[in-house]
Amino acid sequence: MPDHLFEVSWEVCNKVGGIHTVIATKALTVTKRMGDNYIVVGPDLMQESQNPEFEADDTLMTAWRESLYEEGIRVRIGRWNVEGRPIAILIDFKSLISQKDDVLKRLWEDYHVDSISGQWDYVEPVLFGHAAGMVIKSYAENFCSSADKVVAHFHEWMTASGGLYLRKNATGVATVFTTHATVAGRCIAGNGLALYSDLHKFNADDLARRYNVTAKHSIEKMAAMYHDAFLTVSDITANECKYLLGREVTHITPNGFENDFVWQGEEYTTKRAAARKAMIEVAEACYGTKFEKEPLIVGTSGRYEYHNKGEDLFM
């Protein structure tokens, strides 16, 4: 087990999809084993408003936080409001926007990451990941001894630049990259192609160009190649990685949840009834009518990938 573990995701204190659930629901177990040597790192996207998932604590690592600020990196440090309450570092990566060309240039020179076609939905996560790598490097230099085992775990292409940064600048930090679904695989499935039966026939680089995701696919592919360990969550995605990213995964780590992830008994019944009532009220407001009998509710959540969720028509 490592002495220090960082877990980096765009979904730390920022619920987008299932990765938020994966990390949040294991935090209790990890903090029981590692205490405050387990730190989660996410983007600071709600600076002007209250983030209900984050509780700032100005007493945590005050001097170090101020030293980061002097280096041009703004962070907030506190606790993630989930079971286990791990230390959370939220990074304001906007200070790196003026350096974006240099960051992207270095990714090309060091790893041949092709960022030319990347738009802001690519650039912002890359800057966040890069800043996360800088923060982890600084932490290791200030709080860890040369004998400590330090591991930084990066989820999805949105954070991959962090691991690539550490590989060049902090060789004492072991890097782990997990993909929960490949960029090319999402495109193949979302466009009605036979992902699993024809997987061995696809050229992922060509597909990325066709669907205009070259930059995202490129950094994901290089992350798979150059992190110390490459993980995914199932046999199916492991096969995707083999054919679309060109590297077999080091390990498969199935998603796991705490036993109390779903409410039990009366608490479950009460919360379900309240949620159903709220959904019906919203639907009635949208339609401008009252439903005469109990309606059937079909809902989707997480990423806006309707076809991948089995919906051929969305209105």
Over which residues does each language-model region extend?
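Catalytic cores of nucleotide-sugar-dependent glycosyltransferases that transfer UDP/GDP/TDP-activated
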Residues: 1-315
